Design a protein with these regions (language model features):
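Catalytic-domain carbohydrate-binding cleft regions of carbohydrate-active enzymes
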Residues: 1-311, 438-600
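Catalytic and substrate-binding regions of extracellular carbohydrate-active enzymes
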Residues: 250, 254, 262-268, 272-479, ...
């Protein structure tokens, strides 16, 4: 980019390259480059060859919390201070949507314009092409494109914007390629005056007509957010670090956040269609053999470990005291059974003012307090579900969601070859094998055997600890003996309130978002939360997993079915439905925690 932009500028022609990228790339380059390289970059910035926008990179934004999102925007602020600029424009590319909870943060950082370019095969949320996105007294002007960026007229003006993108994982164009872009535009728009610009220039043009733009106040959400459920270990560690962040020093925060910022970045490993490139070996016995020996399998698994290193390096940047706290967290999520004694699995019990009973699957089939019912036989709490998805479900999803039927889209959004290993979907729940008690704590031990475990990826052993206290009921779930499985799967834990839930909300980045106020084509069912869910009567905090489906468990990223909160809140513990560059199988032990508190 430096060489091409300089070559075009020094040639004296009308063609220019003003290369714009997320702030992280330039910020990190200047942090690590040699003195000579830093000098070259500084000269390019001052000459107008290189520019950054207000966001560090494209993220699954609702996986973040407010402080991490603000840190990401501070990198642009650091560059602005260094070079005497004021960035007002930002861009997200590929991910189809983001949460409205980020609007106040964008405005607070001085950003006024956001361009969102959607993956060309994905459903575009039903929003105006250009609009004022408003939330909690703040706003950002947004331009939406059905592609990474395309020719777009700015409403009410004679100005248009054209994005000259290269493809995924490609660098900037050559000088001749830039000249060809100019020739093609001049041929198509012979009366136009062409001018290279960055996002700040585009922002100023759009802001000039801001008062004429429609106002939009609905949540959009992220129809790709299911991807972050593919690695429970990474998400669990990430969330715990964000919870402990207020205890860190400022220096610790900067060092750790530099690594943690790349966890919600939307690339989680190598491109599967390129580097795994295997439409066979879905049957588990065949998969287990090839996984041990094939270089392509080992290569993609190594890329997933490399992604986990962001969390490991963030942890290593902390003081011994704070690192020790992270190493200790959650180790007692499910106790080893010491001090517990067996009790009747069919019995009814009372503890700390709660009356309750466990079901044959280990879930709570009764939970009452002070005459109020939270769980019953039809509204279970802590209900575990394992499911595999069928070729028919993928075909239905593909037809409903995908707007472009080409080879790369079928690879990214499908599971080509899975029909050799599964014909129809599977749904399995565990069987309660033992119930133990220690004071106000109960430990349910379950098993999940049969086809789901023998042929697919269902964990064989499960434990749910439920602790009853005056102010709360806490749940801790653990699985062990989970086989890896290439057939796409989803694992859930559901909480279905018996009364309501009226006025339910999902918290994202510190804001309580109404899941019934999501635009068509947006992230309607599945959400990432930084805290949990609430309704008139209660609140459930989720400590270790981010994903929650409002209504029945839905991990497929698009549906036109209405949202039914009365069917409960289903927390997705793990899923492998995505293609692209996410984790394709998972066999680690895992544990998850939730805390329920009444709200009067």
């Amino acid at each position: 980019a430096l060489r091409t932009a300089r070559e075009l500028r020094e040639s004296g022609g009308k063609e220019r390259l003003l290369w714009t990228t997320g702030s992280f790339l330039i910020w990190d380059y200047l942090r690590t480059a040699s003195d000579e390289q830093q000098k070259e970059m500084a000269e390019a910035v001052r000459a107008g060859d290189i520019s950054w926008h207000g966001l560090p990179c494209t993220t699954h934004t609702e996986l973040m919390n407010g402080p991490l999102f603000e840190y990401g925007m501070s990198l642009s602020g650091d560059l602005d201070a260094r070079f005497g600029r004021k960035t007002i424009g930002a861009k997200m590319t590929d991910v189809p949507g983001h949460t409205i909870a980020m609007v106040p943060y964008l405005a607070k950082a001085g950003l006024k314009f956001l361009h969102i370019g959607v993956n060309p095969a994905s459903t575009v949320p039903d929003v105006p092409d250009v609009f004022r996105w408003q939330y909690e007294g703040s706003e950002i002007v947004v331009m939406y494109n059905r592609d990474y960026g395309k020719f777009t007229m700015i409403p009410g003006t004679e100005t248009a914007v054209y994005f000259a993108h290269t493809g995924d994982n490609h660098g900037p164009q050559s000088a001749e390629a830039i000249r060809q872009v100019y020739r093609e535009l001049e041929e198509e728009y012979p009366d136009a005056q062409l001018c290279a610009a960055d996002l700040n220039g585009l922002a100023r043009e759009v802001l000039a007509i801001k008062d004429t733009l429609p106002v939009f106040t609905k949540e959009i959400g992220d129809t790709w957010i299911h991807g972050v459920g593919c690695d429970p270990w990474k998400v669990r560690q990430f969330r715990e670090m964000l919870r402990q962040e207020p205890e860190w020093t400022e220096e610790e925060r900067k060092e750790a956040f530099r690594e943690l910022l790349l966890v919600p970045e939307h690339t989680w490993g190598m491109d599967i269609k390129t580097h795994l490139a295997d439409h066979e070996h879905y049957v588990r016995t065949e998969f287990e053999k090839v996984r041990k020996t094939a270089p392509n399998y080992q290569k993609v698994e190594a890329s997933w470990e490399e992604q986990r290193d962001y969390v490991r390096r963030a942890m290593d940047s902390l003081s011994p005291e704070h690192k020790g706290e992270l190493l200790e967290f959650g180790r007692d999520a499910c106790p080893d059974g010491s001090g517990f004694v067996p009790v009747d699995m069919d019995g009814e019990y009372s503890a700390a003012g709660w009356d309750f009973r466990f079901g044959t699957d280990g879930s709570l089939r009764k939970l009452e307090r002070n005459g109020k019912t939270y769980a019953d036989d039809s509204h279970r709490w802590g209900e575990v579900l394992y499911e595999n998805y069928s070729p028919a479900e993928y075909r239905d999803f593909y037809k409903a969601y995908n707007t472009l039927d080409v080879g790369w889209a079928r690879e990214d959004f499908g599971k080509i070859g899975m029909e050799t290993a599964i014909a129809s979907g599977i749904k399995t729940t565990p069987v309660l094998k033992a119930l133990l008690r220690r004071d106000n704590e109960f430990l349910a031990r379950m098993e999940m055997k049969g086809t789901a475990h023998d042929l697919y990826g269902a964990p064989a052993k499960w434990e749910m600890r439920v602790k009853f206290e005056e102010e709360a009921v806490s749940f801790a779930l653990r699985w062990t003996d989970k086989p890896a499985c290439r057939v796409p799967e989803g694992i859930w834990c559901g909480f279905c309130p018996a009364e309501g839930p009226e006025n339910c909300r999902v918290r994202k980045m510190g804001s309580w978002i109404d899941p019934l106020s999501v635009c068509t084509g947006g992230g309607m069912h599945l959400h990432a939360t930084d805290c949990g869910v609430k309704w008139d009567g209660g609140q459930i905090a989720t400590l270790d997993t981010a994903l929650v489906s409002v209504g029945n468990p839905k991990v497929m990223p698009y549906t036109k079915e209405p949202i039914r909160p009365e069917e409960g809140f289903w927390f997705n513990l793990e899923n492998t439905i995505w293609g692209t560059n996410f984790v394709m199988w998972y066999d680690d032990d895992a544990s998850f925690r939730w805390v329920f508190r009444e709200q009067m």
